[in-house]
């Protein structure tokens, strides 16, 4: 898609800021959808909580990318925080989906997560598999359902089910690196739970690919091609920072430290593979966890 106009909600986050820079470097026009007063003509104002967003602002837009959502690991879970996880995803998606439908925008790329699949244990899953159980799985189901107005309008909707994004600039890796760098990295519980990961570079490339591919729609796993267990990740991360990783944090300690999130996001996992991306011809720059961690630990944060 040459010289496209792309509107992005959530453009200030880890993925959104990297995607904005990559699209502009490729000579696309990026309109940032912001809550504050717009600073220039490349910003569009909205208030998703009140439903305030003028669909006419999207008249000349080729694609909308929605990356809104509070980080699930931002703090210890409570009833109020779990509600904020839902509200920060579902409400903005409803508002944007309706605006896409009203404005006749051709493409909506909407964030989701591999948490959709629940706890897959050793089972390999792809986009053809159904939703799992648990809070995060139901959150993803409701999040994706909120795109229905755009789908019914005839827009091409991509549900970008992202795994753990590996980047030196933020996210899980940046929080964990200080521990691993002094030899305190540890596997969590049994270490047998799977983790679907993707480097930030490939995440951004996959989103650009999804914007440009007219035949790609529906659920698309944005994960590297080789998911690993927590034990394998721990060993690979230690190797990347040249430190041993002999430690294990017992499940009871993980639960004491992280509460409910331990059993939703740390002691269980997804063994998801990117079948839809690979069928469409996408090629990863980082095919293994070693390559992804090498990329993420040798670049400045």
UniProtKB/Swiss-Prot annotation:
This protein's GO cellular component annotations are:
peptidoglycan-based cell wall; plasma membrane
Drop me one GO molecular function for this one: cholest-4-en-3-one 26-monooxygenase activity
Q: What's a GO biological-process term for it?
A: cholesterol catabolic process
Q: A Pfam family in this protein?
A: DUF1731
Note the superkingdom of the native organism.
Bacteria
Under InterPro entries, the record lists:
DUF1731, Epimerase_deHydtase, NAD(P)-bd_dom_sf, SDR39U1
Tell me its family.
Belongs to the NAD(P)-dependent epimerase/dehydratase family. SDR39U1 subfamily.
Name of this protein: Epimerase family protein Rv2216
Which species is listed as the source? Mycobacterium tuberculosis (strain ATCC 25618 / H37Rv)
Q: What is the lineage of its organism?
A: Bacteria, Bacillati, Actinomycetota, Actinomycetes, Mycobacteriales
């Amino acid at each position: 898609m040459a010289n496209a106009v792309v509107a992005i909600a959530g453009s200030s986050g880890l993925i959104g800021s990297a995607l904005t820079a990559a699209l502009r470097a490729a000579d696309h026009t990026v309109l940032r959808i912001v809550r504050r007063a717009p600073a220039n003509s490349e910003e569009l104002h909205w208030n998703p909580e009140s439903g305030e967003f003028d669909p006419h602002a999207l008249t000349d837009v080729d694609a909308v990318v929605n990356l809104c959502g509070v980080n699930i690991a931002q703090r210890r879970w409570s009833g109020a925080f779990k509600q904020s996880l839902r509200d920060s995803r579902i409400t903005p998606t409803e508002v944007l989906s309706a605006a896409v439908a009203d404005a006749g925008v051709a493409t909506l790329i909407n964030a989701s997560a591999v948490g959709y699949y629940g706890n897959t244990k050793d089972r390999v899953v792809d986009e053809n598999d159904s939703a799992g159980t648990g809070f995060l799985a139901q959150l993803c189901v409701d999040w994706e359902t909120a795109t229905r107005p755009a789908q019914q309008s005839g827009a091409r909707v991509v549900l970008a089910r992202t795994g753990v994004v590996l980047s030196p600039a933020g996210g899980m890796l940046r929080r964990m690196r200080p521990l691993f760098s002094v030899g305190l990295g540890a596997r969590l519980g049994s270490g047998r739970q799977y983790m679907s990961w993707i480097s930030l570079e490939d995440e951004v490339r996959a989103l650009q690919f999804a914007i440009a591919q007219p035949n790609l729609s529906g659920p698309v796993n944005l994960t590297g091609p080789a998911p690993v267990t927590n034990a394998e990740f721990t060993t690979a991360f230690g190797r990347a920072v040249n430190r041993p990783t002999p430690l294990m944090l017992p499940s009871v300690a993980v639960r004491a430290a992280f509460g409910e999130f331990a059993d939703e996001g740390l002691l269980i996992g997804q063994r998801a593979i990117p079948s839809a991306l690979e069928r469409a011809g996408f090629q990863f720059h980082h095919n293994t966890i070693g390559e992804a961690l090498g990329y993420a630990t040798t670049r400045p944060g």
